[in-house]
Amino acid sequence: MMNRAYSLRNSRAPTASQLLNPPPPSSSTRSGRLFAPLSHTMRINHAATFTPDLAKRLAVLVKMEKNVMRSMEVTIRGRRDCARQLSYWGEDCDDDISDVTDKLGVLFYEMAELENYLIDRYDQYRMTLKSIRNIESSVQPSREKKQKLLDQIYALKHKDPESPRLVTMEQELVREEAACLVAEAQLSNTTREKFKQAMTFNLDALHEHAEKLNLIATYGRHLLNLIDDTPVTPGEARPAYDGYETSRQIVMDAEHALSSWVPSQPAVNFVKPQIEDDAQSDARSWNEYEAQGEPVPVEQVTHLQDDVQSDTSEIIENEPGMHPHVHAERMSRIASESSDAVPQQTAVQVA
């Protein structure tokens, strides 16, 4: 939700994505302690020194991720301060600058709120990695005990091959090997399950954060269009600014787009698209024309440009959260690029 001073709402309502996927509890790493860089190094060194060998690498990764989250908290505080300062600076400027900086400050403050929510989602990923680390730590003693028994049996066979202790130790070794097999199987299964779960938390959080940042950037660009940057001569007065209602509506549209955003599952296709093969065959045929010094057929140039324009138009039409004015501007730019390509086609045909 936007900053309450500008949001037209008195209470924080859950967004559509939060209703679909309830937010996680607050991150366990939040604190206001000083000496952050020193504590970062101490955490990593402690994990590398006192953690069992099997879990050492993952333990260091978990501590590094905690350092990342602490750094994100610092970034959030700085972004909030910058958003307030931007609005404070524009207060004494002209009407258009004052209004736009005020509204951009709202959007930038919302970016800090999104990053604050990202920390909580990121902590889910880190805590799931910790569960893998705990399993690895529990398997390490079993491995060490098995290896210790093997060393003792080897030493005893060389010292006293007829010792009655060998039978007892070998029976104990069989039990330890069976326990190791169970522990290794559990480790393998848990690692795969928890790793996929952890990365799902991580990638889903990054996907939502990136999509919402894209929405904020889109509406922020539209706010900039309200500023008239036409040069004026000395003594000439600028037209009166009348974009207050428009800027207010843009912020409301951005708020609605952010609150109504829901995740969509991207389709992953591991089969090589046929269109790439067609493009490669077209490229080879163009190279053949160039090698033989012959002009490229106009039909082939037109076909390729039509495909590119069609794909670009489809991407723009399906892009979520795009403001209508921004959509019209991009479509007009595509149309102008297509019209500029006509003289190039004629030149190819004449050649």
Curated annotation (Swiss-Prot):
One of its GO terms (biological process) is endocytosis. Residues 1-33, 318-351 are annotated as: Disordered. Phosphorylated by ksg1 and ppk21. Phosphorylation is regulated by sphingolipid long chain bases (LCBs). It holds the Pfam family Pil1. Residues 320-332 have a biased composition (Basic and acidic residues). One of its GO terms (molecular function) is lipid binding. Negative regulator of cell wall integrity (CWI) in unstressed cells, probably by inhibiting protein kinase ksg1/ppk21 activity and regulating their downstream CWI pathways pck2-MAP kinase pathway and protein kinase gad8 pathway. Activity may be regulated by the transient increase of sphingolipid long chain bases (LCBs) during heat stress. This is Probable sphingolipid long chain base-responsive protein pil1. It comes from Schizosaccharomyces pombe (strain 972 / ATCC 24843) (Fission yeast). The lineage of its organism: Eukaryota, Fungi, Dikarya, Ascomycota, Taphrinomycotina.
